[in-house]
Amino acid sequence: MRSFAIFLLVAIGIFIIDQNIKTLFLEGYYRGGSCIDLSLHFNKGVAFSMFAFIGPYLKWVQALLIGGILYYVLSKGYLKRYAFPAGLLIGGALGNLYDRFVHAGVVDYVAWHCGFNFAVFNFADVAIDLAVAWILIMVYFFPPKA
């Protein structure tokens, strides 16, 4: 029960923080810089705008993937070990999925352009990346005791 509470609090917290930051940019916030711009972009695809050609079906594919991941984590008992990173992952994923349904694309706002143009991203993306790194580190460097 404690693991589920941690998971839920982290997921809800990430979702709320993500949506509040995105609201700032949807309301016109902009900050230009020499290496990083904080400006509104809508990503119709996934990372690096891949799969944008799927169009309106992408949100349904992502909803199924999120549901599948959630089912797998809960049914296999992984939540006990990975409650916090799973919360990061699901909270970020739901934040971006919400954008697809409400704004027809993910609201991105951090644009790196120092020396080269990097993908534009958001807080939810960072939460997802942190979750994946955290889980990989735990799996490979701190495997569960048999």
Swiss-Prot record:
Record keywords, A-Z: Aspartyl protease, Cell inner membrane, Cell membrane, Hydrolase, Membrane, Protease, Transmembrane, Transmembrane helix
Main localization of the protein described in the UniProt heading: membrane
Catalytic activity, as annotated: Release of signal peptides from bacterial membrane prolipoproteins. Hydrolyzes -Xaa-Yaa-Zaa-|-(S,diacylglyceryl)Cys-, in which Xaa is hydrophobic (preferably Leu), and Yaa (Ala or Ser) and Zaa (Gly or Ala) have small, neutral side chains
Catalytic residues of the enzyme: D108, D125
Subcellular location as annotated: Cell inner membrane
MF-aspect GO terms: aspartic-type endopeptidase activity
Entry GO terms, CC: plasma membrane
Pathway(s) served: Protein modification; lipoprotein biosynthesis (signal peptide cleavage)
Entries under InterPro entries matching the protein: Peptidase_A8
Transmembrane regions: 6-26, 50-70, 82-104, 123-143
Pfam family, one: Peptidase_A8
Enzyme Commission numbers on file: 3.4.23.36
Gene Ontology BP terms: proteolysis
Membrane protein topology class: Multi-pass membrane protein
Function: This protein specifically catalyzes the removal of signal peptides from prolipoproteins.
Family: Belongs to the peptidase A8 family.
UniProt-recorded name of the protein: Lipoprotein signal peptidase
Organism expressing this protein natively: Sulfurovum sp. (strain NBC37-1)
Gene expressing this chain: lspA
